[in-house]
């Protein structure tokens, strides 16, 4: 940890095809072993598939899916006097996006379709319709936070 100054977060380059920062971040999260071109191919194929299936513009469906998966609150463990409490805390905007993208990718990897592009397209279309595993994950996190509302005063 630097002692002199706080180092700012690096700005990632926008997506070359659509010019979207969110899509560039999504490609980076999907990427495995540094294979960015493969990840881009998967995402672009998934977006094309989404356009064919839904008839809407792919970027708007992608953003709607992200919006439906973004968590507003989450729980963090906090140790107080020998016992651990799950304390509900609000999620910062950058983390909201990161969690939503991570959950979409995880849910897509668990699906049964043949190619990753088809799985990703299916999961994003489901998320845009407020269905699917990623949306269920968000609702589980919200439910946990709601159940532990009594410990909200332990926030730090």
From Swiss-Prot:
Listed PROSITE patterns: RIBOSOMAL_S7 (PS00052)
UniProt keyword Ribosomal protein, yes or no: yes
One Pfam match: Ribosomal_S7
Keywords: Ribonucleoprotein, Ribosomal protein, RNA-binding, rRNA-binding, tRNA-binding
Signal sequence segment: none
Entry GO MF terms: rRNA binding; structural constituent of ribosome; tRNA binding
Assembly and oligomerization: Part of the 30S ribosomal subunit. Contacts proteins S9 and S11.
HAMAP family, per database record: Ribosomal_uS7_B (MF_00480_B)
NCBIfam families listed in its UniProt record: rpsG_bact
Name by which UniProt lists this protein: Small ribosomal subunit protein uS7
């Amino acid at each position: 940890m630097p002692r002199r100054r706080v180092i700012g977060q690096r700005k990632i380059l926008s997506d070359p095809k659509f010019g979207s920062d969110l899509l560039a971040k999504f490609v980076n999260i999907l990427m495995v072993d540094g294979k960015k071109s493969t990840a881009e191919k998967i995402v672009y194929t998934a977006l094309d598939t989404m356009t064919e299936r839904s008839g809407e513009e792919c970027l708007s469906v992608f953003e709607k899916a992200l919006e439906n998966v973004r968590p507003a609150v989450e729980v963090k463990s906090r140790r107080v006097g020998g016992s651990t409490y799950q304390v509900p805390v609000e999620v910062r905007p950058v983390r909201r996006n990161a969690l939503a993208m991570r959950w979409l990718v995880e849910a897509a990897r668990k699906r049964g379709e043949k190619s990753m592009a088809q799985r990703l397209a299916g999961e994003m279309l489901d998320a845009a319709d407020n269905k699917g595993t990623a949306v269920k994950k968000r609702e589980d996190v919200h439910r946990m936070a709601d159940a532990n509302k009594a410990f909200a005063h332990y926030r730090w």
